[in-house]
Amino acid sequence: MMVQTRISELLAAMLPHVVFDGWSQASFEYAVADVNMDPGLAAILAPRGAIDLAVAYHRQGDALMLEVYRTTPTDSLKIREKITLAVRLRLEAIGDKEAVRRASSFFALPRNAAEGAKLIWGTADHIWTMLGDSSQDVNWYSKRVTLSAVYGATVLFWLGDDCPSHENTWAFLDRRIEDVMQVEIFKGRIRANKPLSAALVGPLWLLGKIKAPKPRHDMPGRSPES
């Protein structure tokens, strides 16, 4: 708990510098100085420097989304409405749009791209796990791939949405979720079409052999909280 507290302290000190210097080593060093932290301790808390705090910032948003969602009445909502709500709460959990804009550029760099993809995958996994997804086959992957794409596209749209209420972003999100639902309807029609299902028996059999990973903390999206 003490370690997490010190990381949060360092992250809070770094955010004002991120606006001007991005998620950089300079911002990290400024934050260390601002909280009068020993550089050796800072290196232990964040061995990779700025990228570790950028990761912590993203995960902080995930944690806040989960906290707010769990206190929101959702029993009467359809699955698509729950997904929409979760993505919206995730965006509303972000207190600093400029920090996210800088993070988007930071994680777009080739050396950071894999970490950025892992974070988005983790957000999608948190949402599906929170919604009670029990998939044990290829659907475990397809749901998270699809939601990762929806979330990533919505974040980029949100960054360019200057409307204070972000109405355009929520409309964009609704359209993306609708697109996903249409794909699911199409998949259902394929399964219901006996001649087509028979023609695809081979590929479907192979897909059926794909299983969801067993819980492991070192896999994308499989954090201890999952």
Locate predicted features.
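Hydrophobic alpha-helical connector segments
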Residues: 68-102
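C-terminal ligand-sensing/allosteric alpha-helical core of TetR-family HTH transcriptional regulators
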Residues: 79-93, 119, 123-130, 176
